[in-house]
Regions:
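AMP-forming adenylation/ATP pyrophosphatase catalytic core
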Residues: 2, 7-38, 58, 64, ...
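Core alpha/beta nucleotide-donor-binding catalytic domains of modification enzymes
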Residues: 2-206, 235
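Proline-centered helix-kink/hinge sites
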Residues: 87, 164, 206, 213, ...
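PAPS/PAP-binding and catalytic site of the sulfotransferase fold
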Residues: 176, 200-208, 263-275
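Internal, active-site/partner-interface "lid" segment
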Residues: 190-197, 217-227
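Conserved anion/nucleotide-ligand pocket segment
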Residues: 203, 207-219
Length: 449
């Protein structure tokens, strides 16, 4: 029978070979090192396997400053890395809880952002089987969908994140630490049952395990099965997406609502939001999106907030992801020859000289160009043989969504609307084919997710 240390080494080597078997050169791993028993054991195990697996190791410690002992934790991590001759980095961060996540969740979010920024080729964390069980239970209690219930993958390809201990119990890790004299710290906040995860770990799981001894393994297995279902849904959505998406995945063709069954539609919308790195909205909001589109008339302008910063809007047979703008900026600015002109809250303008294109500098004469926001009611005549039209009508003809029309900057000379960036130039001011003209491109930050 294998001893507990052998079990750890065997699991890590097996996991490594599954994900890095095609690697021709050394694998560059950065260990997320908190100073706790799990991460300190992970560092030691990878150090022992360094030669066998051809590893290049480094470690990073995130200093939250939330504990009076934080400096001590950092020093312990540094001392251990010096002892093992492993490159060590530490990063101090301030916790931003403006999103109302709570200190625990906000700290976790900030920690992962820094870890991924600082990590080399692959980030390695010491999450284990008990962590997975706790995560699944928390997601169940929140009423999460498949993505939440799948919990933590062993290897996250997109984020280059490896969790080699995920199939190992906390008990095995602690025994390894004891048998190998691993130095580690105890975070005093782990005893605080005001935090949901600690409450489950200290109050609920002991009772579950006493009644159902296989609780931890069973929950881990359930998370694996949910992950398989999630992967199947992703594969179906990827196939469906080929027929219903724009190239940049910013908008979704609403034809899906009449050609696909409801569950496939919801699945594709979830995939779309995930593809654009949006937090998954509640089932109530998903039902609202579906119901409003099904009932909507051709010209309906649907606007459903899926978070404090993003909304799903409908226009001209498409669903769009649109940033929520708190207020419209008003401006009246003079162009002084800049190649790039930053606009208040609505992107920037790029000015270029082009032969036979854009605004004629000769026809403009000494008049200055004024850059203004739209106020409504503007009229424009880009074609000599066409009547003057309202700008709204002309922009509707090119299917510009109303939220972009609201932000669109326009260019005046005296009282004449001479140019609309990304659309056209007043016919009387168009540059002749053999003359230098001024082209103006609008880059709309608000349309970028």
């Amino acid at each position: 029978m294998k001893n507990k240390s052998d079990v750890i080494f065997s699991e890590v080597v097996s996991s490594f070979n599954n994900f890095f078997q095609d690697q021709k050169k050394s694998v560059d791993l950065t260990v997320g090192l908190s100073g706790g028993v799990d991460s300190m054991v992970l560092l030691n195990v990878l150090y022992q396997l360094k030669t066998k697996l051809n590893l290049k190791l480094s470690a990073i410690h995130i200093h939250h400053g939330l504990s009076k002992n934080a400096d001590h934790w950092c020093k312990l991590c540094l001392d251990e890395c010096v002892r093992l001759d492993i490159d060590f980095y530490q990063k101090k961060i301030n916790i931003d809880n403006s999103e109302g996540l709570g200190i625990e969740a906000a700290a976790r979010k900030a920690r992962y952002q820094i870890l991924h920024q600082q990590a080399n080729e692959v980030l390695v964390t010491a999450h284990h089987q008990n962590d997975q069980a706790e995560t699944l239970m928390l997601q169940l209690l929140r009423g999460s969908g498949l993505k939440g219930l799948a919990s933590m993958p062993l290897f996250d390809k997109e984020r280059r994140l490896w969790r080699p201990f995920l199939k190992l119990s906390k008990e095995i890790i602690e025994e390894y630490a004891k048998n190998n004299d691993i130095r580690f710290v105890e975070d005093e906040s782990n005893k605080n049952t005001e935090f949901d995860r600690n409450f489950l770990r200290l109050e609920i799981f002991p009772k579950l395990i006493n009644r159902f001894p296989q609780t931890i393994k069973s929950l881990g297995r359930s998370a694996d099965l949910v992950a398989e279902g999630l992967n199947l849904n992703k594969a179906i959505a990827t196939e469906d997406a080929k027929n219903y998406f724009s190239e940049d995945f910013n908008k979704l063709n609403t034809k899906i609502f009449s050609t696909l069954p409801r569950d496939r539609v919801i699945n594709l919308i979830r995939w779309w939001l995930d593809k654009n790195q949006q937090k998954m909205p509640s089932q109530k909001i998903m039902d609202q999106i579906y119901a409003q589109i099904i009932k909507a008339k051709q010209d309906a302008q649907i606007n459903i907030h899926i978070s404090s910063k993003m909304s799903v809007r409908a226009y001209k047979d498409f669903l769009w992801l649109v940033k929520i703008k708190k207020e419209k900026n008003s401006f009246d600015l003079i162009w002084k020859g800049e190649e790039m002109f930053e606009l208040p809250g609505s992107g920037k303008l790029l000015f270029k000289s082009s032969l036979g294109k854009g605004i004629s500098l000769d026809k403009l004469g000494s008049s200055v160009l004024r850059i203004q926001n739209r106020k409504g009611g503007e009229r424009f005549k880009p074609e000599r043989n066409q009547p003057t039209r309202t700008l709204k009508y002309l922009l509707q003809k090119i299917n510009m969504p109303p939220w972009e029309r609201e932000l669109l900057p326009i260019i005046y000379s005296e009282d004449i609307l001479v140019a609309v960036p990304n659309f056209g130039v007043h016919h009387e001011f168009v540059a002749d084919e053999d003359k230098i003209g001024l082209t103006i491109e609008w880059i709309n930050y608000e349309s970028k997710i």
